[in-house]
Amino acid sequence: MKRAMLCISPVGIGAWRDFGGALVLTLIFVVARRQTSFRRSDLLPLLGVAILGFAWPHSIQPELVGRIGGAFVGMTVGMTPLLTILVSVPMLGVYPTSRQVFGVIGALLCMAFLMRDGLRHHVALSDLLVAFSVPTTYSIANCWIRRSLRHLPPLELTMLCLLTASVVLLPLSLMAGGQRTIDSQNWPVALAAVATLGVAGTGFATLLFNKLVQDQGPLFASMTTNLVPVGAVIWGWADGEHITITQVAALVGILVMVTIVQFGSAQSPPPVAPVEPPA
């Protein structure tokens, strides 16, 4: 994202990464001659998932990375599995076990230490709240997929979500994208960064993630986000970002709590009704 921001605005990065991922998956969908399973009643859930799980995080994360660093932003994504447990109660009617409650409380304490450390290092409270809104919207989107869109094949679901997010973000990137200096040295780097982010980091990665959500449930699928904060810290350290001992300790604590919560969370794929799938 840092490389892409050399020439492209944050909203533009979100728009073009979603469009790039959608383009690749659409080509695969057409070549494979897949039959569409989308129904008119899926429109509202699809729009909600596209905005909460794609448009919002993909457009706000580049701005946050520029302000508070990729390592700190990546750490907040580690909260996704714990927040999924909380969101699953009202959206899916799934109540946490005592072990999961313990893990959520422990992770919230670690998150409090992480926020306190950020405030001590002059990170604006508004930036912290926006950063933690990302795993929250991810959790809501994951549960929404499980509740209302699980009858859609993962390829079609991901393709439609990315296309919808692109339709939302592309006009916004033109109206409120801001100006960036474009030069011959930075433009190829920024373009390559967005292309890689769109095709690999958004298209194929989200396709695999949505398949996990549908097959194993949002909690187990969100376990893959454990790799995000670890990779973000390593990348941030290599990129010269300031990483404190408190941040590392809080990250380790969050990962431990996530491991406790997700122990044995995988489940067998539930049967899918042949007629009248949930809308």
Language model features with spans:
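Alpha-helical transmembrane segments of compact multi-pass small-molecule transporters, enriched
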Residues: 20-24, 76-90, 105-106, 164-168, ...
